[in-house]
A protein has these predicted regions:
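An anion-engaging/catalytic patch
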Residues: 1-118
Length: 118
Protein backbone atom coordinates (compact mmCIF):
# COMPACT_ATOMS: atom_id res chain seq x y z
CA UNK A 1 0.00 0.00 0.00
CA UNK A 2 1.32 3.39 -0.96
CA UNK A 3 0.48 6.94 0.12
CA UNK A 4 0.09 10.19 -1.73
CA UNK A 5 -0.41 13.65 -0.31
CA UNK A 6 -3.35 15.74 -1.50
CA UNK A 7 -4.03 19.17 0.02
CA UNK A 8 -2.00 18.18 3.07
CA UNK A 9 -3.89 14.92 3.62
CA UNK A 10 -2.30 11.47 3.34
CA UNK A 11 -4.37 9.27 1.02
CA UNK A 12 -3.65 5.53 0.77
CA UNK A 13 -3.87 3.71 -2.53
CA UNK A 14 -2.84 0.41 -4.04
CA UNK A 15 -2.71 -1.30 -7.39
CA UNK A 16 -4.19 -4.64 -8.30
CA UNK A 17 -4.33 -6.06 -11.82
CA UNK A 18 -3.18 -2.68 -13.16
CA UNK A 19 -6.13 -0.91 -11.52
CA UNK A 20 -5.67 1.85 -8.96
CA UNK A 21 -7.82 1.76 -5.83
CA UNK A 22 -7.89 4.88 -3.65
CA UNK A 23 -9.01 5.05 -0.02
CA UNK A 24 -12.44 6.65 0.28
CA UNK A 25 -11.90 6.52 4.04
CA UNK A 26 -8.86 8.79 3.78
CA UNK A 27 -10.66 11.16 1.40
CA UNK A 28 -13.61 11.30 3.80
CA UNK A 29 -11.26 12.13 6.72
CA UNK A 30 -10.45 15.37 4.92
CA UNK A 31 -14.11 16.42 5.25
CA UNK A 32 -15.24 14.83 8.53
CA UNK A 33 -13.95 12.46 11.20
CA UNK A 34 -17.11 10.33 10.88
CA UNK A 35 -15.88 8.66 7.72
CA UNK A 36 -18.18 5.65 7.85
CA UNK A 37 -21.32 7.80 7.99
CA UNK A 38 -20.04 10.07 5.24
CA UNK A 39 -19.43 7.14 2.89
CA UNK A 40 -22.79 5.53 3.73
CA UNK A 41 -24.63 8.81 3.12
CA UNK A 42 -22.90 9.12 -0.25
CA UNK A 43 -24.02 5.58 -1.11
CA UNK A 44 -27.64 6.44 -0.26
CA UNK A 45 -27.76 9.07 -2.99
CA UNK A 46 -29.66 8.06 -6.12
CA UNK A 47 -27.10 9.68 -8.43
CA UNK A 48 -24.31 7.73 -6.71
CA UNK A 49 -26.17 4.44 -7.22
CA UNK A 50 -26.76 5.33 -10.88
CA UNK A 51 -23.07 6.14 -11.36
CA UNK A 52 -21.88 2.96 -9.63
CA UNK A 53 -24.32 0.85 -11.65
CA UNK A 54 -23.10 2.35 -14.92
CA UNK A 55 -19.45 1.88 -13.92
CA UNK A 56 -20.05 -1.77 -13.00
CA UNK A 57 -21.97 -2.35 -16.24
CA UNK A 58 -18.94 -1.14 -18.20
CA UNK A 59 -16.26 -3.06 -16.28
CA UNK A 60 -17.87 -6.01 -14.49
CA UNK A 61 -19.45 -8.89 -16.39
CA UNK A 62 -20.51 -10.54 -13.09
CA UNK A 63 -22.44 -7.54 -11.79
CA UNK A 64 -25.79 -8.51 -10.23
CA UNK A 65 -28.26 -6.24 -12.05
CA UNK A 66 -31.25 -7.61 -10.15
CA UNK A 67 -29.87 -6.41 -6.80
CA UNK A 68 -28.76 -3.17 -8.42
CA UNK A 69 -32.38 -2.49 -9.45
CA UNK A 70 -33.51 -3.03 -5.86
CA UNK A 71 -30.95 -0.47 -4.64
CA UNK A 72 -31.80 1.95 -7.43
CA UNK A 73 -35.50 1.83 -6.57
CA UNK A 74 -34.81 2.48 -2.87
CA UNK A 75 -32.07 5.09 -3.30
CA UNK A 76 -32.92 8.49 -1.88
CA UNK A 77 -35.63 7.24 0.48
CA UNK A 78 -35.22 8.20 4.13
CA UNK A 79 -35.45 4.53 5.11
CA UNK A 80 -32.73 3.43 2.67
CA UNK A 81 -29.40 2.45 4.23
CA UNK A 82 -26.44 0.99 2.38
CA UNK A 83 -22.92 0.16 3.49
CA UNK A 84 -19.99 -0.43 1.14
CA UNK A 85 -19.91 -4.08 2.26
CA UNK A 86 -23.63 -4.47 1.55
CA UNK A 87 -23.17 -3.00 -1.93
CA UNK A 88 -20.25 -5.30 -2.75
CA UNK A 89 -21.80 -8.47 -1.30
CA UNK A 90 -25.20 -8.09 -2.93
CA UNK A 91 -24.15 -6.82 -6.36
CA UNK A 92 -20.77 -8.55 -6.84
CA UNK A 93 -19.30 -5.08 -7.38
CA UNK A 94 -15.60 -4.72 -8.17
CA UNK A 95 -15.37 -0.92 -8.15
CA UNK A 96 -15.49 -0.69 -4.36
CA UNK A 97 -13.45 -2.86 -2.01
CA UNK A 98 -13.62 -3.01 1.77
CA UNK A 99 -10.64 -4.09 3.83
CA UNK A 100 -10.53 -4.85 7.52
CA UNK A 101 -7.65 -4.49 9.89
CA UNK A 102 -4.78 -2.12 10.41
CA UNK A 103 -4.64 -0.78 6.86
CA UNK A 104 -8.32 -1.31 6.26
CA UNK A 105 -11.07 0.95 5.08
CA UNK A 106 -13.15 1.48 1.98
CA UNK A 107 -11.26 1.69 -1.29
CA UNK A 108 -12.63 2.49 -4.72
CA UNK A 109 -11.39 2.37 -8.28
CA UNK A 110 -9.87 5.73 -9.15
CA UNK A 111 -12.87 6.66 -11.35
CA UNK A 112 -15.23 6.14 -8.42
CA UNK A 113 -12.88 7.75 -5.89
CA UNK A 114 -12.66 10.91 -8.00
CA UNK A 115 -16.47 11.02 -8.20
CA UNK A 116 -16.64 10.65 -4.41
CA UNK A 117 -14.13 13.48 -3.94
CA UNK A 118 -15.94 15.88 -6.28
Amino acid sequence: MEQLEVLGAEIAYYRTSEKDYISLTDIAKYKDKRTEQLIQNWLRNRMTIEYLGLWEKLYNSNFNYLEFEVFRNKAGLNSFLLSPTGWVNKTNAIGIITKRGRYGGTFAHKDIAFEFAS
